[in-house]
């Protein structure tokens, strides 16, 4: 009798564990699905599209047919540009750019262009012809489409433009207008005035409204707040209000907002993901304003700083308590603090890698005299395709470009252990690690189905994902 009771309890426990496992997997799938269906583009991309300068305006159907019959077609599978047809000049090469999917079977179609955030397994240009090269533009962090950050998925593409320095067109400096923006002293406040302002301001400012991202930054900042005062203006850990006229995300680049932040000695610059070369305005903004960024994000950020002593690197401190003690030390000692501002006062950017990246890139940021990075991406693919067209006319040998895992790669997200085990934190914070693990299976399933080279359904895709568990 005892054995039967024990056996019954054992099977009930097993059933309960299996049920919890399925529940967790279902939650991960739901959350990933939300990101998979995400339709909103970053404001940066939207603004860039408004600035696009086409060689020719959209033409009548008859003229479009004439153009596409004479030039290689670059088909945007993601409707990023919104252009039904445009002839683009790329140096001495010319290509026809369109979002019209009816051109997929056209013999002049040579490249399919994807925007990573919109890359969706629901509809892919399959079967993939041997003459079709795939190109990926993805400037975002992994939270927008995790599956692309694994070797089986990223290597499906021939051409890439990502935040990684290893991609074919690196976008590492995408949030920096230029070297002059770093050197500018328009918002610089003297240390003497900042010391006076400290009577009503905390030493640190934090501005985030995207809470509980893969980097788990809010957990770290929450712990840091136990040891040093932080003025938090965003929705995350909010404790201080901005003036009503700038209390909107659209005002993040407003001069009044910059004047407010420029009054702080230190600004917390925490990325939403920890990936090499993934560096955003969170780093560049305090550097441009003359504040000291307290940075957490790209492990190799020192490769991109304007000076060896221009930012405080969070990863160098074993605990937020130690970081707080160091910031307090600088806050009380003007001589030590000014060592982090010296480069700014003298306009001395001595990082050769940063200087080269800015001066040699083929695109500009908020600069109407230069191509934007989407134009540059289109032209990179266009030039490569045209080069192969010429090589094929001369003989059978053509160039083959391929992405490798370094073109888009991030480690698994980790959470900080400062919080108690049963702390009532959001489920989003706990979701990123299982999402990352599942995305490995998704990347593998995607690769398998694409190599099969015929259309597939979402049911087939998810069945294969579960098969890989």
Curated annotation (Swiss-Prot):
UniProt keyword list: Disulfide bond, Endoplasmic reticulum, Glycoprotein, Glycosyltransferase, Membrane, Signal-anchor, Transferase, Transmembrane, Transmembrane helix
Glycosylation sites: 100, 158, 308, 333, 455
Keyword Transmembrane in record: yes
Spans within the Lumenal topological domain: 31-469
TM regions (residue ranges): 10-30
Location of this chain's protein in the cell: Endoplasmic reticulum membrane
InterPro entries: Alpha-1_3-FUT_met, Glyco_tran_10_C, Glyco_tran_10_N, Glyco_trans_10, GT10-like_C_sf
Family: Belongs to the glycosyltransferase 10 family.
Protein name stated in the entry: GDP-fucose protein O-fucosyltransferase 3
Native source organism of the sequence: Xenopus laevis
């Amino acid at each position: 009798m005892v054995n039967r009771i024990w056996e019954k309890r054992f099977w009930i426990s097993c059933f309960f564990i299996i049920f919890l496992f399925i529940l967790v997997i279902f939650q991960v799938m739901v959350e990933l699905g939300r990101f998979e269906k995400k339709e909103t583009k970053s404001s940066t991309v939207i603004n860039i599209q408004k600035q696009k300068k086409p060689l020719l305006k959209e033409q009548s159907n008859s003229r479009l047919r004439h153009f596409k019959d004479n030039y290689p077609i670059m088909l945007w599978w993601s409707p990023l540009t919104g252009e039904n047809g445009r002839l683009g000049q790329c140096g001495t090469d010319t290509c026809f750019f369109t979002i019209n999917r009816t051109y997929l079977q056209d013999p002049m179609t040579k490249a399919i262009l994807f925007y990573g955030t919109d890359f969706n397994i629901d509809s892919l240009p399959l079967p993939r012809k041997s003459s079709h090269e795939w190109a990926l533009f993805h400037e975002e962090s992994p939270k927008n489409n995790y599956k692309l950050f694994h070797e089986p998925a990223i290597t499906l593409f021939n051409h890439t433009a990502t935040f990684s320095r290893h991609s074919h067109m690196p976008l590492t400096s995408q949030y920096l207008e230029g070297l002059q923006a770093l050197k500018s002293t328009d918002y610089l406040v003297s240390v003497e005035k900042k010391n006076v302002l400290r009577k009503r301001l905390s030493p640190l400012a934090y501005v985030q409204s995207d809470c509980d991202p893969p980097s788990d930054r809010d957990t770290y900042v929450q712990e840091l707040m136990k040891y040093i005062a932080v003025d938090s203006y965003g929705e995350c850990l909010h404790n201080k209000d901005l003036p009503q006229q700038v209390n909107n995300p659209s005002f993040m680049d407003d001069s009044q907002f910059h004047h407010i932040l420029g009054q702080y000695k230190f600004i917390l610059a925490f990325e939403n993901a920890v990936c090499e070369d993934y560096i955003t305005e969170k780093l560049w903004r305090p550097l441009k304003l003359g504040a000291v960024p307290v940075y957490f994000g790209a492990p190799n950020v020192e490769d991109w700083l304007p000076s060896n002593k221009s930012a405080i690197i969070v990863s160098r401190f074993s605990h937020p308590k130690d970081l707080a003690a160091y910031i307090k030390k600088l806050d009380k000692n003007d001589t030590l603090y000014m060592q982090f501002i010296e480069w700014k006062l003298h306009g001395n950017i001595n990082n050769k890698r940063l200087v080269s990246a800015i001066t040699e890139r083929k695109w500009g940021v908020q600069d109407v005299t230069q191509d934007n990075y989407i134009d540059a991406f289109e032209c990179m693919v266009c030039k490569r395709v045209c080069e192969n067209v010429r090589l094929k006319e001369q003989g059978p040998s053509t160039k083959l470009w391929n992405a490798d895992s370094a073109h888009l790669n991030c480690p698994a997200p980790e959470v900080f252990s400062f919080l108690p085990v049963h702390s009532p934190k959001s489920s989003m914070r706990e979701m990123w690690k299982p999402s990352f693990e599942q995305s490995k299976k998704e990347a593998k399933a995607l690769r398998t189905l694409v190599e099969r080279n015929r259309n597939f359904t979402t049911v087939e895709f998810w069945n294969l994902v579960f098969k890989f568990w």
